[in-house]
């Protein structure tokens, strides 16, 4: 019987299955950070258990770390406790830890691929919803809760039920100024935040194949905002080339063995999907979110929706609530929305290609005087690469702050946050109420669109700044 990519990875990791569909899956890779792991390690300690396979877990501090001068340590007491606790837990249980001052430190979903820890055909879990990012490598990757983190540490397995197969085909070529961030925002706008519920999404089509590894990571990263359990893209030569020579990638004959398996990781012709939709790349435009859900998208040349045009009373009330929280009036042009801050970074758009995209727009230009703008590289290695290319100088010359790596203003768990009423053009993944700080207002955009907004002081069309 023809199988999907998801079917193949699932079957290869099945330890046991009950009659009701409950299954036990082997977990190849476990990523850990400081926020969702303390109780898990404490549970092991209280039960007198060890980490079953310490070499299959990699830990890093990313959520709470400061992005300003780290020589002063962590000012917030609670954040310091979480980071210190992760370090001591990793020492006690023999887990590799990339500390705050390790140049390899960064956002968990960026450092995994950088180190070659992320590999095709593996099951990867992390106590973090954006674990789907690693699906860009043809891995089955998804977020888990703290009790599940403990279960994986103790057993290297996880109890799951198989999801449905959902394929999204995107064919064609993207117009100038349109990026993979716009593609995933368009998809979420189309299917809604519940559109992928109970499914694993495989992204396919000529556009997906043409994307770089990092662009694919952006798409898989936001799969969770479309309600799905995980997002997958079949691995190809771009993925193999990316992983070759990485510190934790297979070496010598192990590389040859791995390649043999990796090359088999594709959906068979004739495999059945429970749901399938098609998009045309040429129809996608630069996107922004206007409201308080990732499905609240409009094109940059569009208008904020008007609740009066909505027949459904619940949807009408929801629109009114979002408009009220966001401080927007119905029918406002997207380009008339004034912003206060710009944030370029996160596990969605904090990689080197994202920084290049923004720097290209900002070169020889200045940000608007009223805008506070920051770039937070996704890892120490991204920061180092950007500095070698002189991107930091472009950002600083245009008036941006050049920061240390971490999650930063994506979720405002460190000092980087919006004040009540402040409006931000952000390259992150969530625009919920209070996500970037209590009362903060978030508009999700691509790195190029964030740069354009910084220059004009309003949400703006990146195509104006491109040849």
Curated annotation (Swiss-Prot):
InterPro entries, alphabetized: 3-IsopropMal_deHydase_lsu, Acnase/IPM_dHydase_lsu_aba_1/3, Acoase/IPM_deHydtase_lsu_aba, Aconitase_4Fe-4S_BS, Aconitase_4Fe-4S_dom, IPM_dehydratase_rel_enz, IPMI_cat
GO BP: any one term:
L-leucine biosynthetic process
Q: Tell me how the cofactor is bound.
A: Binds 1 [4Fe-4S] cluster per subunit.
Query: EC class of this enzyme?
Result: lyase
Q: What is its EC number?
A: 4.2.1.33
Q: Which residues bind [4Fe-4S] cluster?
A: 347, 407, 410
Q: Name one Pfam family in it.
A: Aconitase
Q: Which cofactor does it need?
A: [4Fe-4S] cluster
- Any one GO molecular-function label of the UniProt entry: 3-isopropylmalate dehydratase activity
Pathway(s) served? Amino-acid biosynthesis; L-leucine biosynthesis; L-leucine from 3-methyl-2-oxobutanoate: step 2/4
* Keywords, comma-separated and alphabetical: 4Fe-4S, Amino-acid biosynthesis, Branched-chain amino acid biosynthesis, Iron, Iron-sulfur, Leucine biosynthesis, Lyase, Metal-binding
Q: Which reaction does it catalyse?
A: (2R,3S)-3-isopropylmalate = (2S)-2-isopropylmalate
Does the record's keyword annotation contain NAD?
A: no
Question: Whom does it interact with, and what assembly results?
Answer: Heterodimer of LeuC and LeuD.
The text of the family note is: Belongs to the aconitase/IPM isomerase family. LeuC type 1 subfamily.
Return the protein name.
3-isopropylmalate dehydratase large subunit
